[in-house]
């Protein structure tokens, strides 16, 4: 006869791939929704058009960061390229510049940062947490899936860091991170 600990360990190992698949499915669903939402989008916020769109297109056309003396407004050069580098990565993958790709890339960053609350042991609770976070972001920052601004991204990334720190069970890892 097998002892209970051995059987429990086997059962736990059997559940791990299923939890990963469920989490991945949620991620995939959010990515598909994001893709559909961003189809045929145009810039909706002044910052998106004035900075993020211009810097993204510059990166795609010139294949390098702007330098002093380039045709861009000098005020743009004073600001870090930030997420436009990730937008550029997606332009490069798709082989073209598109506003739709900009928003889609931004949403992948957002969804990835939100995914810190996913608990592979409790998918229903994870979906509730994701929903609450999206609602809170929308209440505080407006429609976060239709903006290229980084304010809400910085907030959710900071939240993600605190969430990881707070939920870490190994005290030594807490001290290292």
Say what each PLM segment does.
Residues 32-34, 40, 47-49, 136-138, ...:
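Short hydrophobic/aromatic segments of transmembrane alpha-helices and their interfaces
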Residues 20-25, 80, 98, 124, ...:
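Alpha-helix initiation/capping motif
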Residues 9, 53-54, 157:
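A ubiquitous, low-specificity "background" feature that marks scattered single residues
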């Amino acid at each position: 006869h097998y002892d209970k600990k051995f059987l429990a360990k086997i059962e736990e190992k059997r559940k791990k791939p299923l939890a990963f698949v469920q989490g991945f499915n949620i991620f995939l669903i959010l990515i598909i929704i994001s893709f559909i939402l961003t189809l045929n989008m145009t810039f909706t916020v002044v910052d998106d058009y004035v900075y993020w769109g211009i810097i993204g297109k510059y990166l795609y056309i010139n294949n390098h960061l702007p330098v002093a003396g380039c045709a861009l407004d000098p005020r743009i050069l004073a600001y870090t390229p930030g997420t436009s580098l990730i937008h550029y990565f997606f332009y490069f993958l798709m082989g073209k510049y598109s506003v739709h790709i900009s928003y889609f890339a931004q949403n992948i960053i957002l969804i990835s940062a939100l995914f810190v609350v996913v608990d592979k042991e409790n998918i229903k609770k994870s979906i509730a947490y994701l929903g609450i976070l999206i609602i809170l972001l929308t209440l505080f920052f407006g429609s976060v899936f239709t903006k290229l601004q980084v304010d809400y991204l910085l907030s959710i990334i900071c939240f993600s860091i605190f969430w990881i720190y707070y939920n870490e069970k190994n005290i030594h890892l807490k001290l290292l991170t």
